[in-house]
Amino acid sequence: MSWSPSLPTQTCGAWEMKERLGTGGFGNVIRWHNQATGEQIAIKQCRQELSPKNRNRWCLEIQIMRRLNHPNVVAARDVPEGMQNLAPNDLPLLAMEYCQGGDLRRYLNQFENCCGLREGAVLTLLSDIASALRYLHENRIIHRDLKPENIVLQQGEKRLIHKIIDLGYAKELDQGSLCTSFVGTLQYLAPELLEQQKYTVTVDYWSFGTLAFECITGFRPFLPNWQPVQWHSKVRQKSEVDIVVSEDLNGAVKFSSSLPFPNNLNSVLAERLEKWLQLMLMWHPRQRGTDPQYGPNGCFRALDDILNLKLVHVLNMVTGTVHTYPVTEDESLQSLKTRIQENTGILETDQELLQKAGLVLLPDKPATQCISDSKTNEGLTLDMDLVFLLDNSKINYETQITPRPPPESVSCILQEPKRNLSFFQLRKVWGQVWHSIQTLKEDCNRLQQGQRAAMMSLLRNNSCLSKMKNAMASTAQQLKAKLDFFKTSIQIDLEKYKEQTEFGITSDKLLLAWREMEQAVEQCGRENDVKHLVERMMALQTDIVDLQRSPMGRKQGGTLDDLEEQARELYRKLREKPRDQRTEGDSQEMVRLLLQAIQSFEKKVRVIYTQLSKTVVCKQKALELLPKVEEVVSLMNEDERTVVRLQEKRQKELWNLLKIACSKVRGPVSGSPDSMNVSRLSHPGQLMSQPSSACDSLPESDKKSEELVAEAHALCSRLESALQDTVKEQDRSFTTLDWSWLQMEDEERCSLEQACD
């Protein structure tokens, strides 16, 4: 459907006529706009010169459109009141929803699609058109004229939606009409329609297969520039599995059963769709669409299997090759790694699978964890969801990447750039050259993404290392504080012990134990280990900062972008040449751009792999440091527990020493009540019970002396009683503790047992 200039203004109430959208088999399609509500509709009106038979078929199309209801078939609308009166004849108007995206032909003609649509766009198109055809066939409707001009695009909530239009193909397929009205669209018609034979729904299979092939490759499958008669006689010679009949640059006709390159499909989709196209493009209608698994008309179910594939794309950073793996919902990551090992030779244990942000695929999640729906991006994104494969057994990544082999026609002009080609040959081969430069740029960008994913992974490991470094520093400080406290405490204890040995308690075993503690804590601390690790981590940090600051670590653009833009401009100028200027020409300028692009690609790849090797080396250092830091932290924690244990032991020994001292207090010492013979008294007040007559007979001075002695005895008695109560209370407290670990002298043990008795 081609866009036309605006028509003379015409209104019908709030409705205003806008531009002509296109011309169909029966008449014109015009856009109308409601100025009050903003609603837009497409009005299809018939030409006056229709034959009676086609007038009846026009009315039949309107009836069909009004009863259909499917998201991929354009919907009928009510004709606004009064608009029927504007019709040029008595035939009814057909009102339809307006799809602002234009038709598929307009989309295919965009320069970017010269070698086929993007993968996501191909999948959405196949899904939508297959769904629409299924619906029509279930309602016993055969479209018979499926082509890009009869598919329109509507922007949905998440993606573009494709809708089939123009169900009014009802021309009589006599020889005259075929050579006039259908010139340019014959290649979408099934052979049996051209041969005026009986047909079934399989005519739509041929049209759908031809349409799908063009969307994948950018050109029609069978001699697109040949006239109908010669076309028919040559194409019918193809085998049942041939899906391409083309001319090379020398004019030789070639038949092939393979999907041609270039296209934008991954290897798995290309292989599966190649087999599906072989079903759809069979020359004989009885065999067409028959699937080996699903039988006759099983092509739609076979396509469902393809569209429902879940694919994981793995970019091997060692070779630069993308491997695509179909996976099931419950397939484990380990299973995927086994398949990767079979394809790449990289051992499962050495495989590191990174996502774009540098995240490692989780082993406890299924292989589908890295898949997003490629059909929701409308094919606009240039990059598939890639998983980047690194080989952990490698430190130095050598540049092994070479550009993809060019298509056959591009190889020819590389060998003979001065060779003159026809305009149609130039248009095709120049489009392929431009696509080849685009591919070089995209391959370079993917390798750059892989290097950046490795860099992000390094930064994540470095972040973990930094946290562990901080934990190590904190643990080291805590340990140092406890060591300093312990060393200071035991030094003071040793000094005080030495001071009291002349008149106090002595114990060689206790002194030896303290000396051993002092030596034991000297082995704690790990200061040298911590210092060495910090130095290595600081050196690694410097290397990482240098990597981030390096221009090589940033996105590589520049020359390849410029060359791709120059090639696009050359191709655009060729496409837009007026018809009278479409003459032969050579490809020297295009070849020059392609050769420069190849050189630029190889240079950028060397830069990327130099950066990747440095990144891998830094990551290896970080991975080596992580367990060493963990080990040192673990040893420091053990040292801390040792210091705490020694501190507890020393404190228990001090308390035991105090117990021994207290036990000695209960023995005869200078100034004790026993030295004053207080213990021989039956009662502390015995001295006070002497007869008063004896006291009276003493002189006055003797009486005073006797009173002082009695008072002293009383005080001593009370002191002895208080001391005994205190010792008993201490005994009850001490005996609740376990002192079995402390070895005591026999004499001291006996003394303690007597005191307890």
Swiss-Prot record:
Post-translational modification: Upon cytokine stimulation, phosphorylated on Ser-177 and Ser-181 by MEKK1 and/or MAP3K14/NIK as well as TBK1 and PRKCZ; which enhances activity. Phosphorylated by MAP3K7/TAK1 in response to NOD1 and NOD2 signaling, promoting activation and phosphorylation of NF-kappa-B inhibitors, leading to NF-kappa-B activation. Once activated, autophosphorylates on the C-terminal serine cluster; which decreases activity and prevents prolonged activation of the inflammatory response.
Any GO BP: tumor necrosis factor-mediated signaling pathway
Main location class: cytoplasm
Catalytic residues as annotated in Swiss-Prot or TrEMBL: 145 (proton acceptor)
InterPro entries: IKBKB_SDD, IKBKB_SDD_sf, IKK, IKKbetaNEMObind, Kinase-like_dom_sf, Prot_kinase_dom, Ser/Thr_kinase_AS
Highest taxon in the source lineage: Eukaryota
Positions of region (Leucine-zipper): 458-479
Function: Serine kinase that plays an essential role in the NF-kappa-B signaling pathway which is activated by multiple stimuli such as inflammatory cytokines, bacterial or viral products, DNA damages or other cellular stresses. Acts as a part of the canonical IKK complex in the conventional pathway of NF-kappa-B activation. Phosphorylates inhibitors of NF-kappa-B on 2 critical serine residues. These modifications allow polyubiquitination of the inhibitors and subsequent degradation by the proteasome.
Protein name: Inhibitor of nuclear factor kappa-B kinase subunit beta
